[in-house]
Amino acid sequence: MSLMSFKSQVVDAATNKSKTETINYRTTYQDKEYKKQATVYVPAKYDNKKKHNIIYLMHGSTESGRDFYQDGNFKKILDKLNRVDKLKNTIVVFPTYYPNKSFVNSDYYRDRPLNKNFAKKELTKDLMPAVEKKYHTYAKTTDNEGFKESRRHRAFGGFSMGSITTWYVFENNLKYFHDFLPMAGDSWTIKPDGGAVASKRTASRLAESTDSRSFQILAAVGANDGTSGSMTPQIEAMWRLPEFNHQNLKYYTQKGGSHSPQSIGKQFEHYAGELFKK
């Protein structure tokens, strides 16, 4: 083997491996600026000259994006999905809704304003422009128009409080996203635990967020996860409205699944092949 051939094989091997990278950006919360980071999964054979689908996946209470990425074993899952062409050439971003570590606390009800702020402001104004300027997605420009035109190639999902965030993203940013993966968490748009205690009002509020644009909600929960007590009545109430049906709103119960990042990884894998379908 020639030296040139050996070098070429080394380069090919490096290119064929996925990467875990970090992106830095700034955001403002309650008139104070914060420096933040998000973990980014970059697929094998990433080519900055080609367009890539993109998913934003949010963690649960007290976690960070990096924690969720590692605890859910997402690198292994995403490598496998990419290898078998089930979710090929897709960038996956793992952000956090906490402005910094001082906001982390064991009372997850206190996270609600942070979930809402992230969905309504930080996601589209700060995170998405930073990420999609660095990586080549379907957005021709990293402004509102560019994000609108590329919405069919963008998804948002999350676990637990990240699922609460996902419902807020659906409610406020349908124009920028087509696919949604709320896992192990209901919508708190009316009130905390609203899927259980205000299921009809919650469903109606979410229905009001829809328009002529198509969308896909891929909801999931573990069979042994107590959050099913909030998710199930909400999903059933949504199905009773004309805006939702069993095609644009699916609900998967994972056999033996628990309220854990590990179960969420499996729920994500279950739905991966249904993302970004035209």
Regions found by a protein language model. Give the residues of each.
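Non-catalytic cap/lid and distal C-terminal segments of serine-dependent acyl enzymes
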Residues: 6, 10-278
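Bacterial N-terminal signal peptides
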Residues: 1-5
